[in-house]
Structures are given as structure tokens and as C-alpha cells.
Amino acid sequence: MTKEVPYYCDNDDNNIIRLFIIRHGQTEHNVKKILQGHKDTSINPTGEEQATKLGHYLRSRGIHFDKVVSSDLKRCRQTTALVLKHSKQENVPTSYTSGLRERYMGVIEGMQITEAEKYADKHGEGSFRNFGEKSDDFVARLTGCVEEEVAEASNEGVKNLALVSHGGAIRMILQWLKYENHQAHKIIVFNTSVTIVDYVKDSKQFIVRRVGNTQHLGDGEFVVSDLRLR
């Protein structure tokens, strides 16, 4: 019997667009703690298994997406394909965009985190995050993409929208929504975890419902009370 999880279900309210925000499956760079950024890495066998399990889990819950928008990087494309295949949703309209990509890390892409930290220190930078795409530009790109996709979904009558993206990108979206008083960057968004956000049309408000659910992997999630955010 599938455990009941509030809001982890189809939305049938015409005034709401339910966003299912999914992180891609595991890659070898994830395992080795290598900064990927815009590097076009593939998911590994564990990542494939994670995405397959998520697909089966969505099907067991009877969740059907009206539309899917994914980052155009390979690891997200592969995750999207497996999730849709195993949830029997291969015919759902699906598109790919650079707007949902991970943060571009510049010269430190391909370095392990410890190596990137040493590189930053050597070059007089307080953090390796100071390289590549600036935080303001990253936020503007992501939020602009989310708002555009939500507006388009609203015009199309979409009620359940899946967004497939990256760990850093999802944390930044949560931070933009003022989740956990701007401390969202401290949250670990696990591979293939599902974060659920409702967009309420009449109030133009985003409400975070679930964060980082990994029950398809036999785990739990971060506890979220209903937060009316942005």
C-alpha cells in the first residue's frame, strides 16, 4: 500500500498549478564530488535506478503530468526519459531549456570541491562560488524561466507541471521563494528527490508543500509546513 503523503498527488484545482521539481539522477561527478556546472555529464547506473524507481513510484501514486520542462543538459534529459518511461507517461508534452541548467562554474568546472576551494584561496577569492555565473545572474535566469513556464502553463490550462533540474538550481529556487528564511542553500537536495510547490493563480502566490521527497528510494523528506512564500 502506498503511504499517504499530503500534496504528493495529482492536482485537480483549476486555480492551482502544482510544480513537481525533480533533481536529476546520480552521476559519477556527484559520487566524486566534482563540480559539474554546465558540463554535459551522464547519469550512472545508480542514477538510472533512481529515475526508474521514481517513475514506478509516480505511477503507483497515480500522478500524471500535463507537461514536463527539463534542463537541456544530458543528465536531466536522461532522468526525464526514464521517469516518463516507467510512469507510462512517454506521450506527455516535454521540452528542454537552458533556463533550468545548473549554475555555470567557469574555470573550476571539472574540479573536485576541495581542489576548487584551494584554487579560490590561491587566487584571493573568499569562495569557489565567486567563479563563473554570478549569483544575481543565476537567480534571474532560473526565476525568469520558472515564471515564464508557470505563465505558459496557466494559459494552457496545465494543472500538474514537472520541472527537471539540478541540486544547486533547486536550492536557489527555494531560496528565491524565501523557504526557511533564506537558508535554503543549506538543504541537501538528493538525486531524483521531488520538491512540490503550488502556484495559486488568483493570489499569484507560490506555496512550498514538500521539499526533497525521496520515498521512492525508501527514504523520507524534509518536513515542510504550508508556507505561503512568494
Curated annotation (Swiss-Prot):
GO MF annotations in UniProt: phosphatase activity
GO cellular component: cytoplasm; nucleus
Residues annotated to bind substrate: Q36, G37, E102, R103, Y104, M105
Membership in a protein family: Belongs to the phosphoglycerate mutase family. BPG-dependent PGAM subfamily.
Domain of life per record: Eukaryota
Protein name: Broad-specificity phosphatase YOR283W
Entry-linked CDD domains: HP_PGM_like
Species name: Saccharomyces cerevisiae (strain ATCC 204508 / S288c)
Note: Present with 8300 molecules/cell in log phase SD medium.
UniProt xrefs under PANTHER family: FRUCTOSE-2,6-BISPHOSPHATASE TIGAR (PTHR46517:SF1)
Active site: H24 (tele-phosphohistidine intermediate), E102 (proton donor/acceptor)
